[in-house]
Amino acid sequence: MRAPLLSLLLFACWPLMAFGGAQIYEPLADSVRGRLSRMVADRAPATMHFRSAADGQRWLAEMDKRLERRIPDRQQRLELLRAVQYEATRARLDPQLVLGVIEVESAFRKYAVSRAGARGYMQVMPFWVNLIGQPGHNLFHLRTNLAYGCAILRHYLDIENGDYFRALGRYNGSLGQPQYPRSVLAAWKIRWKYDGPTG
């Protein structure tokens, strides 16, 4: 009786657990460290960048609808979506990919913490603050978390010459294991796919 109850409880709590792996500390060349530091230091207002205001409004309305079940507070949803679009575009990433990463990493929970200690929406490991940031950077702060997550993912995509599968494995600390990259790619291409302009 106890084992089935425990299994049911674990299954029910699965969406509350963060998938975040343990991003692995790797020494960075000074030029790479400098580039990533500049990316996470930006404090400009998170303004969405689209070819036209109408394109931006269509994207925001569609993503707002898709995210409603996961984040009931509309103001919080819109703030997250605007910041995702801004930080992803700055890092030359598809905002839809970033939404897929957030879904798998933290299930859209701002204060998620993995067993390895990764934090926030994009499950960033604290060592990155010492490596490329400043001591006051709070990884639970929306813009800070997204700036770090997008900069790190861009870095791994550059290392892997655009290979999403390998870059996502690096991001999660599970390079060579298929489960995490497949989960993110499925979320990106199925739940977050958007055929209109994303930036």
Give the location of each predicted region:
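Positively charged n-region of N-terminal signal peptides that target proteins for export
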Residues: 1-4
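Short N-terminal segments immediately surrounding and downstream of signal-peptide cleavage
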Residues: 22-39
